Amino acid sequence: MSDMIRTQEEITISGNPRHPEGVDGSKMLLRMNESHTPVTGWALGFWTVNETDTVLDIGCGGGAALKRIATQVTTGHLIGVDYSPVSVATARETNSDAINTHKMDILEASVEQLPFADDTFDKIITVESFYFWPSPQKNLKEVLRVLKNSGTFLLVADVYQKEGLSDKTLENIRNFHLFNPTPEEFRTLFEQAGFSDIQIHLKDGKDWICVEGHKASGSR
């Protein structure tokens, strides 16, 4: 059956958003590179990326967010991690120029155990992946561990739990077993993980959320 006949939903189900795999996983990631662009651009407006920053993207998927951030980082370094080999391969292809100039690395790794020393990154972002994190509270503590003092973490999603979600959105949450907290629950998760100066950004007219957390100077 050709992709002209198959629906995007069929490709997404086959491609497995939780752990992209196979040819359909690659197709799904390339589509997500485009569909996630608006929410990513909105969320990045809450950051001031410096040219010397060291930046980590957790659950980097097809690599589009990294490619966008790389335009602002000239002498710093960017790293993407994903536990899906298909995602790693797709993100590497998306960012081949930056990788070839040693400005970026894409690694196969999980948020459960990030392969980095404490206090490594100035900024950390995750776009549309928190839904699938296996142990959200524990995983947020792992993010805080590798974030530098005074560093910033952005959690970006195009849906959060609230009244009035569409039937289709609720169906997707059920079918893909998405972890989908309310803004208040996000704040509690971040507080209990040890983040400070937590800000919840919501987009008017959309279901988008960006949770911004900081690592206080002197934190461990």
Sequence positions of predicted segments:
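C-terminal alpha-helical "lid/dimerization" subdomain adjacent to the S-adenosyl-L-methionine
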Residues: 6-12, 18-33, 154-212
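C-terminal lobe and adjacent flexible extensions of AdoMet/dcAdoMet transferase-like proteins
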Residues: 211-220
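Conserved alpha-helix/loop element of class I SAM-dependent methyltransferases that forms part
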Residues: 34-53, 68
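Class I SAM-dependent methyltransferase SAM/SAH-binding core
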Residues: 54-113
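Short glycine-dipeptide loop
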Residues: 52, 147-153
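A short acidic, Gly/Pro-enriched loop at the edge of an enzyme's catalytic core
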Residues: 112-123
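A short SAM/SAH-binding and catalytic strip from SAM-dependent methyltransferases
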Residues: 123-135
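A short glycine-rich, Lys/Arg-flanked "PGG" loop and its adjoining helix->strand segment in the class I
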Residues: 137-149
